[in-house]
């Protein structure tokens, strides 16, 4: 059993290195990724070691799920189910993005995001409702004011 776990760890590291080399993507082998993730224009994606990505999440190019250097154990964000992460979005630190929310392109998220909301800006602030039941599937990026 230990041998298969060690072999699995080696395989994960090799896969990480190959993806980084070919696509410019760095997904740490320790990150937990849900089913149905969609990475559109798979380039310049960074997902840190303690990040958790829920089911049916869509992320566009240049998304970072990274740390801030301030946390010891859980350093990366928890992304809920059905979230849409716009191009260039940076979600940093031990924070949560609630299910069925949207993070606008170019936003820097440093605080928790409630479910079914849209955040935008640097730093990101709530700018409206998510506007649909499943942003990651509809890929709707129009801001709907509350």
Predicted regions and their residues:
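Left-handed beta-helix
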Residues: 23, 29, 34-35, 40-49, ...
């Amino acid at each position: 059993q230990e041998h298969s776990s060690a072999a699995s760890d080696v395989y994960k590291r090799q896969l990480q290195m190959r993806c980084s080399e070919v696509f410019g993507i760095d997904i740490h082998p320790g990150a937990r990724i849900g089913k149905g993730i969609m990475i559109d224009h798979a380039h310049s994606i960074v997902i840190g070691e303690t990040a958790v990505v829920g089911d049916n999440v869509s992320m566009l190019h240049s998304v970072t799920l990274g740390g801030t250097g301030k946390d010891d154990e859980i350093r990366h964000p928890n992304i809920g189910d059905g979230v849409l992460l716009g191009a260039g979005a940076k979600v940093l630190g031990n924070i949560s993005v609630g299910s069925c929310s949207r993070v606008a392109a170019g936003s820097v998220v440093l605080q928790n995001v409630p479910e079914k909301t849209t955040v935008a800006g640097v730093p990101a602030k709530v700018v409206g409702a998510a506007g649909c039941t499943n942003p990651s599937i509809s890929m709707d990026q129009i801001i709907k004011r509350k």
